[in-house]
């Protein structure tokens, strides 16, 4: 009888691993082909395609800003399970639009739908918070990184291979994966939020302003929120500009991008799925956050000034090691919130991430276009990575100051 909660927790974590794996795989599978798809549908060069990609991502993020607080609060009211399933169906519709879109316009339609319903990651992290206690919470958040890494490996490599067959084939596979996961969740996923821990749905808390107000109850958290919004923006230099960067600077093929994706995913699995479980007890949450951010910044600077394609593998090592900061931050923040506030918290953090998705890809896309356009006075495709490193530096200064304070409710 004593082992029952452990068995349930283990089974739930396995499902969340699969959910995040398929979700990230669906996102990663399109990475090698999205530059070529935009060039083809929009009849533009890669510099302009990078700009379009920024707007495409921003459209998704704006919908997330408007609707993620609603989805987070709904998960606190009705449970995590139904929200996860709705999100997966939304992604299935989005990828279907991408697979059969006759023009760029329909890509925007699909991204809008996915942005409205997309709460997979925030609900999954709230789910983990529901079933985790004490020191295991931060370690369990490492599952998110491990699943993301494996999904990234399979997604990017599979996308590179499938894109060589047909440029729209990866989107069909992504749609099928999202649908499969929704069906899998419908029959297998248990609810994690007990009815006694649920609360009434409140519109004043289910909007962007309401989420900021709730986050504002925690003085030091505001500083961390600002800092990690800057980190999210900096990460977009790698997440959304990397294919454009290596296509432009090194004239890589889709297969080459896929191979780099394999390496990045392998690193994420090793660091966030295994190494972090030793580093958190050894260094503590705060030290992991700082060391991770410094490593992020170093990696971005090295990538910016890379001269040969093989160096991308070497310089991705410090960048990927920076991933230890994410689970540490999640564990640090979630420990300050009650069980019936976890959905709202994750909705608020997703809101901040979505703000970075509006600003990051647009800023990084414009900087890439500005320094690679044929009329540019200075040719430097690494500009987005320099900008990202500067944002990391600012975030480190803010985090150091914020962590000196205790996060206590300002009530």
PLM-predicted stretches and their roles:
Residues 109-149:
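Cytoplasmic helix-loop-helix junction between adjacent transmembrane helices
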Residues 66-79, 271-285, 368:
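Helix-to-loop junctions at the C-terminal end of transmembrane segments
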Residues 65-104:
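Conserved MFS/SLC helix-loop-helix module at the cytosolic interface between two early adjacent transmembrane helices
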Residues 2-10, 190-227, 248-249:
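Juxtamembrane intracellular "pre-TM" segments in multi-pass secondary transporters
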């Amino acid at each position: 009888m004593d082992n029952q909660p452990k068995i349930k927790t283990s089974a739930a974590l396995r499902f969340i691993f699969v959910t995040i794996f398929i979700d990230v795989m669906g996102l990663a599978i399109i990475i090698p082909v999205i530059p070529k798809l935009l060039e083809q549908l929009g009849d533009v060069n890669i510099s302009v395609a990078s700009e379009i990609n920024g707007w495409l991502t921003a459209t998704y993020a704006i919908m997330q800003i408007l609707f993620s607080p609603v989805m987070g609060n709904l998960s606190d009211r009705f449970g995590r399970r139904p929200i996860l399933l709705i999100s997966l169906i939304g992604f299935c519709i989005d990828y279907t639009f991408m697979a059969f879109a006759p023009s760029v316009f329909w890509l925007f339609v699909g991204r809008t739908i996915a942005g409205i319903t997309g709460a997979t990651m925030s609900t999954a992290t709230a789910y983990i918070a529901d079933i985790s206690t004490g020191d295991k919470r931060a370690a369990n958040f490492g599952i998110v990184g491990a699943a993301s890494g494996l999904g990234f490996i399979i997604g990017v490599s599979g996308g590179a291979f499938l894109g060589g067959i047909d440029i729209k084939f990866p989107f069909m596979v992504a749609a099928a994966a999202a649908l499969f996961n929704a069906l899998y969740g419908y029959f297998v996923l248990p609810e994690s939020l007990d009815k006694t821990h649920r609360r009434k749905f409140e519109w004043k808390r289910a909007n962007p302003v309401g989420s900021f107000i709730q986050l504002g109850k925690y003085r030091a958290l505001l500083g961390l929120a600002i800092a990690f919004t800057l980190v999210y923006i900096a990460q977009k230099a790698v997440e959304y500009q990397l294919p454009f960067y290596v296509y432009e600077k090194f004239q890589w093929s889709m297969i080459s991008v896929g191979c780099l994706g394999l390496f990045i995913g392998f690193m994420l699995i090793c660091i966030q799925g295994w190494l972090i479980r030793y580093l958190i007890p050894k260094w503590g949450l705060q030290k992991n956050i700082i060391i991770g951010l410094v490593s992020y910044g170093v990696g971005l600077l090295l990538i910016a000034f890379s001269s040969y394609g093989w160096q991308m593998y070497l310089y991705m090592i410090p960048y990927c090691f920076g991933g230890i900061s994410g689970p540490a931050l999640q564990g640090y923040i979630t420990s300050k919130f009650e069980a019936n506030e976890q959905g709202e918290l994750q909705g608020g953090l997703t809101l901040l991430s979505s703000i970075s998705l509006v600003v990051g890809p647009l800023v990084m896309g414009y900087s890439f276009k500005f320094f690679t356009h044929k009329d540019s006075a200075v040719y430097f495709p690494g500009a987005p990575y320099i900008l990202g490193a500067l944002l990391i530096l600012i975030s480190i200064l803010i985090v150091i100051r914020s962590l000196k304070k205790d996060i206590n409710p300002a009530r």
